[in-house]
Design a protein with these regions (language model features):
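Long, contiguous binding/interaction regions
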Residues: 1-152
């Protein structure tokens, strides 16, 4: 969508359609690229995250049963959330699992610095990063919806 208004209208259209079908919509959310105009960057003179917004990164990591405890330790020590379920099964012992880091306060440069620390820690411990998706949430009706999930 070309602008925030169009994205918001499409989100509302989908939400209303689901409600009309009898579904209980518990959350409405719009995620954008991290370079969205609303995203805070120090180089632009920003000093504060816009209200209700946050940066988030999803890391798909190749793991084995033997290394899962180590990955869990890394996740906790870097303030990340490690998914409870495998994202993709590769073989009987190897799988891809998702690790998520979210920041409600950091400017992008600080977020990126911590992300690089996470990736360096994974590489040092010989984990293979398969995919990285960085997002900027510009609208979220339940910003604390994932709070328990992220802290688990």
């Amino acid at each position: 969508y070309g602008n925030n208004g169009e994205a918001f209208n499409e989100m509302k259209r989908i939400s209303n359609a689901l409600t009309n079908l009898g579904y209980n919509v518990v959350r409405e959310k719009i995620e954008a690229s991290y370079w969205h105009t609303k995203a805070p960057f120090k180089e632009d003179g920003d000093t504060k995250m816009p209200e209700g917004c946050y940066f988030e990164v999803h890391l798909n990591i190749e793991c084995t049963n033997e290394k899962l405890n180590k990955l869990n330790q890394i996740s906790k020590s870097t303030n990340c959330h490690l998914s409870k379920n495998a994202f993709k099964i590769i073989d009987d012992n190897t799988f891809t699992i998702m690790m998520t880091y979210r920041s409600y306060e950091q400017m992008f440069e600080d977020f990126e610095e911590h992300l690089n620390f996470i990736k360096d820690t994974l590489q040092f411990n010989q984990f293979k990063l398969e995919k990285e998706i960085i997002e900027f949430a510009i609208y979220d009706t339940k910003i604390n919806h994932d709070k328990l999930w992220l802290e688990a």
